[in-house]
């Protein structure tokens, strides 16, 4: 599917879902200002932690690949790639459209675009259409835990599983300069249903050109 990477304000992406689940009312309103063109999205080119994650992404995927190549289930955690599967990275994009008002029609004005851009994915064989697992890479601080990393970015992973119609995602994390760990995360239908409700509520405010919440600027 053709995706305009310069048109992120035309829908909701994975990073937006972090705000929708973990953010405050002020965070929602700030996101609304970006989506409606009132403010520019933050520039991440000088954010050290963001750029470090980008630079170490390939090494992150290398560490993950070595573990998934293992024949031991305790190491590959039930997601072996061996010779029948392969990891791909780069230019993995897709969109999914849902109704803004569930009881409404499917005309363009009632459609919300959910956007997905993956760090990587596992495919069956050489078939670029046969995806079987999403990969999300993060470089976090040394004393963080894998459980906390998954909890923080679960909205993003569940969003991607929804967009790409997948049942599994891998959180692949580098912890400071100490170690690499990963975990397979299953699709959570109840969570996705709740997330879509938040996405619809938020996007209705974008369409109406009215902030999601009336709050004092204190």
Language-model segments: what does each one mean?
Residues 1-59:
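Charged, glycine-rich intrinsically disordered N-terminal tails and low-complexity linkers that flank
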Residues 30, 62, 155:
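Short, contiguous clusters of charged residues that form electrostatic/catalytic patches at enzyme active sites
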Residues 53-74:
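Signature of the catalytic double-stranded beta-helix
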Residues 68, 72-207:
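Nucleic-acid nuclease catalytic cores
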Residues 207-218:
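Helix-loop elements that line ligand-binding/catalytic pockets
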């Amino acid at each position: 599917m053709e995706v305009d990477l310069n048109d992120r304000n035309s829908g909701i992406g994975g990073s937006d879902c972090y705000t929708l689940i973990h953010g405050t009312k002020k965070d929602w309103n700030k996101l609304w200002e970006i989506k409606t063109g009132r403010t520019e999205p933050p520039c991440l080119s000088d954010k050290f932690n963001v750029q470090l994650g980008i630079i170490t992404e390939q090494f992150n995927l290398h560490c993950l690949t070595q573990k998934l190549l293992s024949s031991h289930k305790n190491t590959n955690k039930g997601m072996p790639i061996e010779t029948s599967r392969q990891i791909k990275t780069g230019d993995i994009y897709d969109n999914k459209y849902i109704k803004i008002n569930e009881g409404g029609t499917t005309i363009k004005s009632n459609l919300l675009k959910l956007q997905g851009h993956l760090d990587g994915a596992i495919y069956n064989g050489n078939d670029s259409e046969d995806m079987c697992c999403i990969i999300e890479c993060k470089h976090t601080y040394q004393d963080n835990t894998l459980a906390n990393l998954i909890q923080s970015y679960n909205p993003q992973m569940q969003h991607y599983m929804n967009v790409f119609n997948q049942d599994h995602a891998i959180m692949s994390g580098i912890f400071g300069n100490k170690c690499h760990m990963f975990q397979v995360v299953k699709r959570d239908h109840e969570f996705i249903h709740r997330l879509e409700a938040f996405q619809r509520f938020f996007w209705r405010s974008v369409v109406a050109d009215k902030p999601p919440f009336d709050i004092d600027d204190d």
